[in-house]
């Protein structure tokens, strides 16, 4: 199976299945001499791990990261870093009924058509369980960014809409994000979303969400025209996350409704020999290259396909069947997509920063 790696200079390859003994990744391109321990990975992994509230899957996993290589006495050596996360709470019997049936909305059918074989236990390789190792790789990417830039680069995400109920942007407060089970920047939306998901769970159904990712402190100049544009790589990274069906950068699809004079971000002297922008419809990227403004991306996450409501499908013999997905599933998988989205943005930025350094030296201002 191809397509298991992401990145160019900063590159990671993931492996493992949802109900296998472990999942993991191998991260390449990390410069030597960067302080790194398993604890650096664990903070982000703990934000993503399941079973932390009634609004996520009740599968219990510690998601404890083990660094197997590439680090000596707490410092990176420049060699590949292997990270292992053991699976400890699999319940494969929950999937015995669908071993020969294709679940609507899942990758069951497409994996079967392509490979002629699939692992039905929890979705196997296509499960969102794989995203844990993306978060581990993203934590390493954050360390690379800080080391190369000589300063922190802030990457944060939040759920801005769930089940059609959107936040009030005037209430945006980053301090609220980690203070509630929804990663909501609007504390006033916690109660409505609780009521929404409680009802969805009772119905045996699910809802989708919109996640917004913001990267602040990105230096200008990251990105490679024409086919390795920064925004194109960000879109690919975010679209590769399970259940994501759409990505927009900056104003995104709203830009199609604007006139030219409203959409193009005007520039003025910043008094320091550079420029400042009067708006940020571009989302921090022009011509595929970062402008130095805040990078803003949004991703649409579809409703979890594993639901208790019977749906029509076919089995591996082409016969009509009804499918009900048992097991422990997220009523809104968009919640736990927040740290995953942050991680993928970190990976892209680390990759492009190393590529910039290799071609041009350090970015302007560093």
UniProtKB/Swiss-Prot annotation:
Catalytic activity: 5-O-(1-carboxyvinyl)-3-phosphoshikimate = chorismate + phosphate
Pathway note: Metabolic intermediate biosynthesis; chorismate biosynthesis; chorismate from D-erythrose 4-phosphate and phosphoenolpyruvate: step 7/7
Top-level lineage group: Bacteria
Entry cofactors: FMNH2
Alphabetical list of Gene3D superfamilies matching this protein: Chorismate synthase AroC (3.60.150.10)
Residues noted as binding NADP(+) in the record, renumbered to the chain: 48, 54
GO-annotated biological processes: amino acid biosynthetic process; aromatic amino acid family biosynthetic process; chorismate biosynthetic process
Cofactor comment text: Reduced FMN (FMNH(2)).
Assigned keywords, A-Z: Amino-acid biosynthesis, Aromatic amino acid biosynthesis, FAD, Flavoprotein, FMN, Lyase, NADP
GO molecular function: chorismate synthase activity; FMN binding
UniProt-annotated binding residues for FMN: 125-127, 242-243, 287, 302-306, 328
Keyword NADP part of the UniProt annotation: yes
EC number: 4.2.3.5
Gene Ontology cellular component list: cytosol
Membrane spanning stretches: none
Protein task: This reaction introduces a second double bond into the aromatic ring system.
Family: Belongs to the chorismate synthase family.
Subunit structure: Homotetramer.
The protein's name in its UniProt record: Chorismate synthase
Organism: Rhodospirillum rubrum (strain ATCC 11170 / ATH 1.1.1 / DSM 467 / LMG 4362 / NCIMB 8255 / S1)
Lineage: Bacteria, Pseudomonadati, Pseudomonadota, Alphaproteobacteria, Rhodospirillales
């Amino acid at each position: 199976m191809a397509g298991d790696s992401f990145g160019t200079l900063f590159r990671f390859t993931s492996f493992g299945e949802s109900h296998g003994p472990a999942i993991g990744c191998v991260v390449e391109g990390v410069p030597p001499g960067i302080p790194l321990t398993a604890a650096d990975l664990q903070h982000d992994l703990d934000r993503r791990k399941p079973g932390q509230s009634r609004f996520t899957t009740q599968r219990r996993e510690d998601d404890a990261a083990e660094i197997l290589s590439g680090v000596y006495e707490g410092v990176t050596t420049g060699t590949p870093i292997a990270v292992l996360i053991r699976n400890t709470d699999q319940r494969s019997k929950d999937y015995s009924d669908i071993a020969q049936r294709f679940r609507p909305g899942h990758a069951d059918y497409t994996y079967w058509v392509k490979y002629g074989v699939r692992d039905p236990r929890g979705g196997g390789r296509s499960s969102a369980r794989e995203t844990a190792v993306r978060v581990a790789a993203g934590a390493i990417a954050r360390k690379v960014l800080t080391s190369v830039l000589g300063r922190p680069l802030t990457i944060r995400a939040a759920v801005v809409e769930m089940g059609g109920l959107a936040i009030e942007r005037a209430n945006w407060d980053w301090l609220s994000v980690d203070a509630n089970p929804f990663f909501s920047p609007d504390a006033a939306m916690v109660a409505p979303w609780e009521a929404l998901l409680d009802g969805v769970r009772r119905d045996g159904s699910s809802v989708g969400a919109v996640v917004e990712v913001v990267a602040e402190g990105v230096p200008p100049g990251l990105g490679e025209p024409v086919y390795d544009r920064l925004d194109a790589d960000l879109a690919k990274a975010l679209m590769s996350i399970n259940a994501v069906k759409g990505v927009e950068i900056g104003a995104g699809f709203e830009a199609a409704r604007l006139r030219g004079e409203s959409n193009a971000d005007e520039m003025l002297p910043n008094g320091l020999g550079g420029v400042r922008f009067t708006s940020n419809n571009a989302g921090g990227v022009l011509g595929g290259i970062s402008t130095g403004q805040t990078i803003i991306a949004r991703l649409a996450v579809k409703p979890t396909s594993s639901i208790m409501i019977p749906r029509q499908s076919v089995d591996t013999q082409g016969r009509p069947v009804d499918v009900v997905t048992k097991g422990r599933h997220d009523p809104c998988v968009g919640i736990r997509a927040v740290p995953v989205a942050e991680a993928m943005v970190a990976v892209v930025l680390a990759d492009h920063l190393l590529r910039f350094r290799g071609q041009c030296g350090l970015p302007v201002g560093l």
